[in-house]
Amino acid sequence: MICLLQRVTHGSVSVSNETIGQISSGLVVLCGFQPHDTTESLEKMAHKLLHYRVFSDEDDKMNLNLQQAFSGKGGDLLLVPQFTLAADTKKGLRPSFHTSASPDLAHNLFNEFVALITLKFGPPQTGKFGANMQVSLINDGPVTFWLET
């Protein structure tokens, strides 16, 4: 599994000009899936995502995770499925998607990942799997990390 994590002051996702998910300060996470992903890799990513220290403490050091930074203040999480994250870009000028999970598998994995996050953190805002989405965000920092399991 691949996650592109972005610390934001605002994030939203729309389909057909209708906002389907929106957050204030927190994380926008683009999620890509590969054929070898399993429940175990999703659990590892959920743990990593929720405990990754990307928010500043009182000394302005990135030392706080999502729950610590917003304890009781409503830190938000927006998960967006993104098929293209797992593309093979090593050869040529056109990406190949043989390294991406099939649409059916990726859809199931995304739903399972959302369920894991809901269990461990609470319900996230989400994009719509398979839809043409417009994602807007205000990156804070910018702080962006590529996470893999």
UniProtKB/Swiss-Prot annotation:
Superkingdom: Bacteria
EC top class named in words: hydrolase
Keywords in alphabetical order: Cytoplasm, Hydrolase, RNA-binding, tRNA-binding
Claim: Transmembrane is one of the keywords in the record: no
Enzyme Commission number(s) from the entry: 3.1.1.96
Membrane spanning stretches: none
GO CC, one annotated term: cytoplasm
InterPro entries: Daa-tRNA_deacyls_DTD (IPR003732), DTD-like_sf (IPR023509)
Gene3D superfamilies linked to this entry: D-tyrosyl-tRNA(Tyr) deacylase
UniProt subcellular location: Cytoplasm
PANTHER family in UniProt: D-AMINOACYL-TRNA DEACYLASE 1 (PTHR10472:SF5), D-TYROSYL-TRNA TYR DEACYLASE (PTHR10472)
Subunit structure: Homodimer.
NCBIfam families membership: D-aminoacyl-tRNA deacylase (TIGR00256)
Family per record: Belongs to the DTD family.
HAMAP family tied to this protein: Deacylase_Dtd (MF_00518)
Domain notes from UniProt: A Gly-cisPro motif from one monomer fits into the active site of the other monomer to allow specific chiral rejection of L-amino acids.
Name of this protein: D-aminoacyl-tRNA deacylase
